[in-house]
């Protein structure tokens, strides 16, 4: 939604800055509606929550893998590459045929779906951010993306550290500091003090690990919250 920081930044402000054309679907994205819309629009960049790719994967790919000649061919090692190319083209065509990159965020990606998309060299990358960071924290081009990660944090624009004795192997809370970190919640000093410390570090509430090159991996939440597949935050 454009009312969200992510939607405002990447579906509105970024296209305005570069002269991009934006298409807002305006309807619930069922696989049928999505495929029909993509055939007309033929987008070059798609920013979406994981559920969009997962729906198309289940609709377009799984039936081929689970039955028919292709399911048999997949079991023959020498045919794998050819089969992957066929599936990749079918998926790309389902999204209009012109997509150069899929930027996914807002919720965890199903590991089975992510693993398969990377196996067929689908142009996918997963980013990470939050409203309080306006909103991007990490992003990596698809050709540099590491499986199960959410990209490298934006070095030069912000600092990120893991509150852990061993940030690479032991999960700790992800802390962020930089110019585009918020100054505080509007007229809510109590909540502001809970997430922003005296040194300017934003305590995200997300638990993660980080590679030496700055690649982030989300491992869970330090707060009680359910994050649904469509990006909705549910507080039980």
Task: Give residue spans per PLM region.
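Active-site loops of AMP-binding adenylate-forming
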Residues: 109-111, 115-123, 130-148, 165, ...
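Adenylate-forming
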Residues: 54-60, 102-103, 111-115, 132-141, ...
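Conserved AMP-binding/adenylation subdomain of ANL enzymes
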Residues: 5-89
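Short acidic loop-to-helix transition motifs that present clustered carboxylates
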Residues: 28-33, 109, 132-133, 234
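Short Gly/Pro-enriched turn/cap motifs at secondary-structure boundaries
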Residues: 148-155, 198-199
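Active-site glycine-centered loops adjacent to acidic/histidine catalytic or metal-binding residues
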Residues: 106, 129, 151, 206
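Short gly/Ser/Thr-rich phosphate-binding loop of adenylate-forming enzymes
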Residues: 74-122
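Conserved ATP-binding/catalytic segment of the ANL
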Residues: 161, 166-228
């Amino acid at each position: 939604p454009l009312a969200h920081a992510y939607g405002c930044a990447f579906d509105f402000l970024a296209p305005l800055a570069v002269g991009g054309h934006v298409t807002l679907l305006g309807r619930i994205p069922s696989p049928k509606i999505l495929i029909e819309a993509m055939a007309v629009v033929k987008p070059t960049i798609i920013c979406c929550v994981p559920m969009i790719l997962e729906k198309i994967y289940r609709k377009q790919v799984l039936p081929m893998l689970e039955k028919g000649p292709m399911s048999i061919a997949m079991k023959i090692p020498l045919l794998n590459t050819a089969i992957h190319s066929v599936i990749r083209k079918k998926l790309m065509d389902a999204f209009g045929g012109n997509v150069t990159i899929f930027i996914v965020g807002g919720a965890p990606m199903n590991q089975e779906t992510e693993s398969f998309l990377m196996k067929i060299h689908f142009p996918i990358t997963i980013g990470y951010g939050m409203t309080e960071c306006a909103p991007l924290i990490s992003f990596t081009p698809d050709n540099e993306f590491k499986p199960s990660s959410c990209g490298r944090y934006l070095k030069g624009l912000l600092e990120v550290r893991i509150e852990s004795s061993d940030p690479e192997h032991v999960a700790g809370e992800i802390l962020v500091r930089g110019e585009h970190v918020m100054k505080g919640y509007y007229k809510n000093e109590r909540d502001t003090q809970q997430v922003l410390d005296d040194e300017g570090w934003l305590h995200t509430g997300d638990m993660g690990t980080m590679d030496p090159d700055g690649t982030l991996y989300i491992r869970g939440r330090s707060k009680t919250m359910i994050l649904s597949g469509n990006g909705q935050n549910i507080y039980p």
